[in-house]
Amino acid sequence: MTEPLKPRIDFAESLSGPQEPVLKPAQIFNEKETANFCPASPELEAEEREGQVEGIVNAALKPKRSGWRKMVYGSLMLLGLSAVAQFVQWIYQSWQQQDWSALGVAAAGSMIVFAGIGSLVSEWHRLYRLRVRSEERDTARALLQHHGVGKGREFCEKLASQAGIEQHNPALQRWRAALHDTHNDREVVVLYSKWVQPVLDSQVRAEISRCAAESALMIAVSPLAIVDMAFIAWRNIRLINRIAALYGIELGYFSRIRLFRLVLLNIVFSGASEVVREVGMDWLSQDIAARLSVRAAQGIGVGLLTARLGIKAMELCRPLPWIEGDKPKLGDFRRQLITQLKNILPNKSKNIVN
């Protein structure tokens, strides 16, 4: 049997051909508008956001200037000038009266004053060196975005000289031999960061690893909290001084305070989540709590915080920004800490002295 034919369907509208795409009119940009366009860079955007956050915190922590503060500073300045004038007048009167004992006291006081002024000048110079290092890092970041020729090599030679790298160092000679006239500034800086900069970075990483391990072991075996706090504070201060010395920076009192402030700010905003993630990874995947004691787990946490402090101090003292994954990871120090604690601490059956 055959099916009946379906009736014809008539459409009121005629078939339309394929629609042509609607093109937008061309847009012509002048030089000023072209300068506003820049390639997207997630790393630079992250750094800018971190810098903005740090700037906001610095502005919040910075005391606001007021009229009372200016009056206090003016009064102190007048008091200092009056003291200097009185001191000079006293020396003149002692000379006129031939009071040699008073002149001896004046000479000793003058030596103390000049020593204090010299100390302030040296502190200012050290603080200036820390500020110059930050400017050098900004210059290196700009050279990494620059495709010109001629500035990169001069900049890197300056960094090698400041770091105290000898001229016959194999890494420095290899870098110089690899340079070619066709290399732009970005390529020159990248080669320096890959071949010469690791000479110092490896020493700094070893120092951070050793200090983190000592802090972790001290917390794991020490029975007194006050001893732990004093030891950790001393080791952290020594770690920052050592990192700065390896990178060719001499820290004074004020520059050390400034570096501590920057390090702690960075840790507060970017370190807490990383520490929690690393510790949680160990507890969930390797069951650290079942293998080590509670004191050992506390030691791992303190060791990770010490390592984080060293990494941020390394970042602030380093003359070059991190390039293509050169930044040390907290997980590397975590594995070293766990291995050392497993090898040194007694077995699970033996209790650690509380």
UniProtKB/Swiss-Prot annotation:
According to its UniProt record, where is this protein located? Cell inner membrane
Keywords in UniProt for this one? Cell inner membrane, Cell membrane, Membrane, Transmembrane, Transmembrane helix
Domain of life, per lineage: Bacteria
| Its membrane topology | Multi-pass membrane protein
Taking the first listed entry, what is the main subcellular location of this protein, grouped into a coarse class? membrane
Keyword Phosphoprotein, does the record have it? no
Q: Which PANTHER family does the UniProt record give? A: UPF0283 MEMBRANE PROTEIN YCJF
Protein name from the UniProt record: UPF0283 membrane protein plu2581
Q: Which organism is it from?
A: Photorhabdus laumondii subsp. laumondii (strain DSM 15139 / CIP 105565 / TT01)
